[in-house]
Amino acid sequence: RRQRQMCIRDSSVWAAGVVFYNVWGGPVLVWLYVAAMACAFALRRKRPVLWRASWGVPALLLAYYLCIPATNDKEWQPSWSRLPSVEINGNEIVVKDVRSFIYRTERDFDARYVTRRFDLDKLATLDFAVSHWDGMEFVAHTMLSFGFEDGKHLALSVETRLPERGEQGSVPGLYKQFNVIYILADEEDLFALRTNYRKEDMYLYRINIDRENLKKAFLGFAEKINSLHERPRYYHTVTANCTTELVDTFKNYLGVRRWQWTPVFNGMCDQNAYDRGELLHLPGESFRELKKRSFLGHGGNGEDWPALRRRWEEGWRTFASAPVKE
């Protein structure tokens, strides 16, 4: 009986969020919903039929929630205004709408989207970025960067696609308030925005992956990126976020189960990846030592992004000709 009451309570609280975020006039109607559910609970002994009938309200709201379709037909904020696309012609990769913004401050920038070309056969490395903000240790934003033999990089970040007048938030992210977007960008945009302008604490690691699986992973991400043009999806704080989307692609396209990074409280996902052998490191190097060496700073030393990248690369020359560890 107690479990049933807890289930009713929790589902009612969740359903209140559906009313607040997804129903016209929600900020007002949610109070009517809460009052009605409270009255039904208070009268549960005198009016048990009314109380039992109220159980169906969260179920109806769940059905309504599940039927809300995602759409690309909205006005989007400039940073998320364009969906990238990836064309594969033999070994040639053509990436359209690569974000390459020029920043003066975090909010003052020139919006610029470009087309980039890469050689699939020259795809050589995959770097994993973990960026913390506001001193939060257990929460982070995770990103990837594909590296090519000719020195080119293509950065990837899974984010909330914010509509005009929309605001970031973990709770709205539970209620279909944002689309999910895969941003493909120059590192000078995606990474430098966080290190040099937002002053976040960012760490960059090299993933332990061979070239064959790296190519499979890239093609898998390309397929997911292209699919969003015809089949947009909602971002979800728990099930479809910056980390779960990366993990799902590694699982689905590489056919391995070792990619098990913590999806929500993902600030420790680099530690988890190290423990599972997913990060390259020097022989005998502890995670603490690796993390210290992988810290990119937060722009306080005045380095621009190319200088940060060059400094970081110096620490990985040891692995230039070394085989991937099992």
Model feature map: region roles:
Residues 185-265:
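Active-site nucleophile-His-acid catalytic modules used for acyl/amide transfer and hydrolysis
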Residues 93, 104-202:
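Glycine-rich catalytic cores of cysteine/serine-nucleophile enzymes that process amide/ester linkages
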Residues 15-24:
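Juxtamembrane "helix-exit" motif on the non-cytosolic side of transmembrane helices
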Residues 31-55:
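Cytosolic-side transmembrane helix boundary signature
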Residues 47-70:
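Internal/C-terminal transmembrane anchor helices
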Residues 70-89:
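Alpha-helical transmembrane signal-anchor/signal-peptide segments
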Residues 267-326:
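A cross-kingdom marker for long, charged
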